[in-house]
């Protein structure tokens, strides 16, 4: 029989408290799942993207978003054994909102780190 092409994908979303880059414990299982995915597909590299809401100066938010992305990368490397060279932390500040910054709920959704991976493989 011919090999069957399959697609595997995973999406990580970690939200943050206001003005914080501390990854909360509730996201550790999600990080574990991403780490297992990366171990299964060992040639994959991933951009870990940090974001903020629009509260505060734009340049501060750019730095905060970078710190958020780096916090997730640090956990993946130090707690879950992923090689640092496979991960790139990128801070996008407030430039890519997923919700309105006019509401408390919207701002909470915008304070996030995202990583999305998709891979095609044969079985």
Where are these regions (language model features)?
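Periplasmic peptidoglycan-binding/tethering modules of Gram-negative envelope proteins
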Residues: 1-45, 78, 82-85, 118-123
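Periplasmic OmpA-like peptidoglycan-binding domain that tethers envelope proteins to the cell wall
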Residues: 24, 51-123
């Amino acid at each position: 029989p011919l090999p069957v092409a399959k697609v595997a994908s995973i999406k990580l979303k970690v939200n943050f408290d206001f003005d914080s880059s501390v990854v909360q414990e509730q996201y550790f299982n999600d990080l574990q799942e991403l780490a297992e995915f990366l171990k299964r597909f060992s040639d994959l590299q991933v951009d870990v993207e940090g974001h903020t809401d629009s509260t505060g100066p734009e340049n501060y938010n750019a730095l905060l978003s970078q710190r958020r992305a780096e916090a997730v990368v640090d956990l993946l490397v130090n707690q879950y054994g992923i090689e640092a060279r496979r991960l790139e932390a990128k801070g996008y500040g407030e430039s890519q909102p997923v919700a309105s910054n006019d509401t408390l709920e919207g701002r909470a959704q915008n304070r996030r780190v995202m990583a999305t991976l998709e891979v095609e493989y044969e079985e």
